[in-house]
Design a protein with these regions (language model features):
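Short, exposed beta-strand-loop hairpins at the edges of beta-sheets
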Residues: 152-154
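Amphipathic alpha-helical segments
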Residues: 22-137, 141-149, 171-172
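Sec/Tat signal peptide C-region and signal peptidase I cleavage site
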Residues: 16-21
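Sec-dependent N-terminal signal peptides
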Residues: 4-15
Length: 172
């Protein structure tokens, strides 16, 4: 009987010890990034590029719209060949705008490349700082609460966002 009690105690202890060793923390990467001036500069640059590209696309779409309106008013006076030519011109203009939109904002577009070039290095530094902090302080899991992640409650003492900023050399 004594052996069974000792064995059960050892099994219980073996099950409880690993649970106590796990430490959790969380960070808010949106907050961290908002405190990094280089990130804000990169975001501003991306916004300016995006606005310029959007204006370029809108200009092409406006040209197509003007061609279409002009075509509609002159349609009755045009031969079938001229109508077909104008319709083709309008479609080419619209297609050109769509291609430009794809070039700038598509899955492998300029915007994505610029984000990779400007934003990713900053995000990588933040990620590395989180990893370093986790290793130094013994956290097994670090959650990110940015963007409304599914964390229902987190004790503010476990928020390590300011510690990450400090590790990156920024004060809050």
């Amino acid at each position: 009987m004594k052996k069974i009690v000792v064995l059960c105690s050892l099994l219980l202890l073996a099950a409880v010890l690993p649970m106590q060793a796990q430490r959790f923390a969380y960070v808010d990467t949106e907050y961290i990034l908002s405190k990094i001036p280089e990130y804000q500069t990169a975001q501003d640059q991306l916004n300016r590029l995006s606005e310029g590209w959007q204006k370029e696309i809108e200009a092409l779409m406006n040209e197509a719209e003007q061609l279409y309106r002009k075509y509609e008013t002159e349609k009755v006076m045009l031969s079938e060949a001229m109508q077909a030519q104008r319709e083709e011109e309008i479609m080419r203009k619209e297609e050109s705008a769509k291609q430009l939109q794809q070039k700038y904002f598509g899955r492998e577009g300029e915007m994505l490349r610029k984000q990779q070039e400007l934003i990713k290095p900053i995000q990588d530094k933040v990620y590395q700082a989180v990893k370093d902090l986790s290793a130094a302080d013994g956290y097994t899991i670090v959650f990110d609460t940015a963007g409304g992640a599914n964390v229902l409650y987190a004790n503010p003492k476990n928020d390590k966002s300011d510690a990450v900023l400090k590790k990156l050399g920024y004060s809050n």
